[in-house]
């Protein structure tokens, strides 16, 4: 059952639900309600809320002293029970010499010069004798209206009629748009708001609209607190609140929208950098002149401390993950008669039968050329512990750009490496098993397959700008995040422009970035 039923059923034990006035459409006579106190005597004032609607209509919420205990209903439902009409305007206004005076003398009270009655016990002011009579029941404990089914008693007839609906299950107020039905007219009014299409309450800053004012106020609290945290001047809101002319309002909203777009662009840029850039330390001054707010000193210090802590931890994790050997330059070991020749790392090797008449005098020079062209300082020698790594065992969701290269298993090497001198060995033109297999492509670059020692194809990634090969997709993604969006040799962290890939790699390796004012 609903809260009304739980409340009314509790009246059997002797306690009554709040005697809030309620006159349904089928009520025999109107039941008045006490008037709100505007003045009291001797500190005996009872707190009440009153609204004069039109003429003799009164709406009020009665106190716990008069009602026993407050009902656990929402405000809209209570408003229906509080709406009372007095049919006799003469009695409401109070005639000194008419029949109303006899009724007043019967219920007691003190006549005031304005024609109203004052309770001689607590000092509450009532507009008529009926209202004062209902009020006196809170002092005497009289509850003349009793339910013949459960025995619950009430001080007003309207409350009894509302209680009887709980037993009968009657829900006369039905929604014409859905199957919703209720016992109270004000509850139906609140329900109809859920079907309304319009959202009259609009935020002047971001333009979002809401059906209820309370939702708009909650949104403004979040919006204002966010903007105050970002140190944006609060005069933008005062302009919106004080502006009444629609044309001037639209002008101000355009300014606010442009400044808000700058803030959102900066936030989006920061998110992209955090996702795709290499962990770096930021040194020097941060001159963010393009932002519509002034970054305070405290904000800069907290931001730099947080970045330093997170970046240091990320670098330590990367070193422990990759190992110290990955930071050393790769040195190719010249073959010493073995049929296994290393290509990129000891894990990925080439199988080639070597002839006795092959000369190896130029192996050292060729190995040096390969090392200079293939900057493999960031590639890690994958061990058996990395077989279960997610980046090696399954397809990564961000690996869509290199899917074609992965399916074909091709590694695009530089044009400076001759077809007969790769990785320190002389490669014949014919292809054979467990070897570097040359595949024809549409571009001018040479394409190769890297085969591991057990005959499996190796997945590799290449940066076309720096001509660097990566065996790990995470390291490849971190490296690609360092390239700028407009210019590949522009540092995505600080905007530094490099002349070529060598200067760019040197700048990234040093890891010291400084913001430059444009």
Curated annotation (Swiss-Prot):
Residues 37-47 have a biased composition (Polar residues). SUPFAM superfamilies: beta-beta-alpha zinc fingers (SSF57667). Keywords: Activator, Developmental protein, DNA-binding, Metal-binding, Nucleus, Repeat, Transcription, Transcription regulation, Zinc, Zinc-finger. It is found in: Nucleus. GO terms for molecular function: DNA-binding transcription factor activity; RNA polymerase II cis-regulatory region sequence-specific DNA binding; transcription cis-regulatory region binding; zinc ion binding. One of its GO terms (biological process) is regulation of transcription by RNA polymerase II. Residues 1-51, 381-405 are annotated as: Disordered. It holds the Pfam family zf-C2H2. InterPro entries: Ikaros_C2H2-ZF (IPR050589), Znf_C2H2_sf (IPR036236), Znf_C2H2_type (IPR013087). Expressed in embryonic hematopoietic organs such as the bursa of Fabricius, thymus and spleen. In the adult, expressed in spleen, thymus, bursa and peripheral blood leukocytes. A zinc finger (C2H2-type) spans 117-139, 145-167, 173-195, 201-224, 461-483, 489-513. One of its GO terms (cellular component) is protein-DNA complex. Binds and activates the enhancer (delta-A element) of the CD3-delta gene. Functions in the specification and the maturation of the T-lymphocyte. Also interacts with a critical control element in the TDT (terminal deoxynucleotidyltransferase) promoter as well as with the promoters for other genes expressed during early stages of B- and T-cell development. Function is isoform-specific and is modulated by dominant-negative inactive isoforms. Belongs to the Ikaros C2H2-type zinc-finger protein family. This is DNA-binding protein Ikaros. It comes from Gallus gallus. The lineage of its organism: Eukaryota, Metazoa, Chordata, Craniata, Vertebrata.
């Amino acid at each position: 059952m609903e809260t009304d039923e739980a409340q009314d059923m509790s009246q059997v034990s002797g306690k009554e639900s709040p005697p809030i006035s309620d006159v349904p459409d089928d009520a025999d006579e109107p039941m008045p309600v006490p008037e709100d106190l505007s003045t009291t005597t001797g500190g005996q004032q009872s707190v009440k809320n009153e609204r004069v609607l039109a003429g003799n209509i009164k709406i009020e919420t009665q106190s716990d002293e008069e009602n026993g205990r407050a009902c656990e209903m929402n405000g809209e439902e209570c408003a229906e029970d509080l709406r009372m009409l007095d049919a006799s305007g003469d009695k409401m206004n109070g005639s000194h010499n008419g029949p109303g005076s006899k009724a007043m003398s019967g219920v007691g009270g003190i006549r005031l010069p304005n024609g109203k009655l004052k309770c001689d016990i607590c000092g509450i002011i009532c507009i008529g004798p009926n209202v004062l009579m209902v009020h006196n029941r809170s002092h005497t404990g009289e509850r003349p209206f009793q339910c013949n089914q459960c025995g619950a008693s009430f001080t007003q007839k309207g409350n009894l009629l509302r209680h009887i609906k709980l037993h009968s299950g009657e829900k006369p107020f039905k929604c014409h748009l859905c199957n919703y039905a209720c016992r109270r007219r004000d509850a139906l009014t609140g329900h109809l708001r859920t079907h309304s299409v319009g959202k009259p309450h609009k935020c002047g800053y971001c333009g979002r609209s809401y059906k209820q004012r309370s939702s708009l106020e909650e949104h403004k609290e979040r919006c204002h607190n966010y903007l105050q945290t970002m140190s944006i001047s609060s005069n933008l809101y005062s302009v919106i609140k004080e502006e009444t002319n629609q044309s001037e309002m639209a002008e101000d909203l355009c300014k606010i929208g442009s400044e808000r777009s700058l803030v959102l662009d900066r936030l989006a840029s920061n998110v992209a950098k955090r996702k795709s850039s290499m962990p770096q330390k930021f040194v020097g001054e941060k001159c963010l002149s393009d932002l519509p707010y002034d970054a305070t000193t405290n904000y800069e210090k907290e931001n730099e401390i947080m970045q330093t802590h997170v970046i240091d931890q990320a670098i330590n994790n990367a070193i422990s993950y990759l190992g110290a050997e990955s930071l050393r330059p790769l040195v190719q070991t010249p073959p010493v008669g073995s049929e296994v020749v290393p290509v990129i790392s000891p894990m990925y090797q080439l199988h080639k039968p070597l002839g006795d008449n092959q000369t190896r005098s130029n192996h050292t020079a060729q190995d040096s050329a390969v090392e200079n062209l293939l900057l493999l300082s960031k590639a890690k020698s994958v061990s058996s512990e990395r077989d279960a790594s997610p980046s090696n065992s399954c397809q990564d969701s961000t690996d869509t750009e290199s899917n074609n290269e992965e399916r074909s298993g091709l590694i695009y090497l530089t044009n400076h490496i001759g077809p007969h001198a790769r990785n320190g060995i002389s490669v014949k033109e014919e292809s054979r098993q467990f070897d570097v297999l040359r595949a024809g492509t549409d571009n001018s670059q040479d394409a190769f397959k890297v085969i591991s020692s057990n005959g499996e194809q190796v997945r590799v990634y290449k940066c076309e700008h720096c001509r660097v090969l990566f065996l790990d997709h995470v390291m490849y993604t971190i490296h690609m995040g360092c390239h700028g969006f407009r210019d590949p040799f522009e540092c995505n962290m600080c905007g530094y422009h490099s002349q070529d890939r060598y200067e760019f790699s040197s700048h990234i390796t040093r890891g010291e970035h400084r913001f430059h004012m444009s």
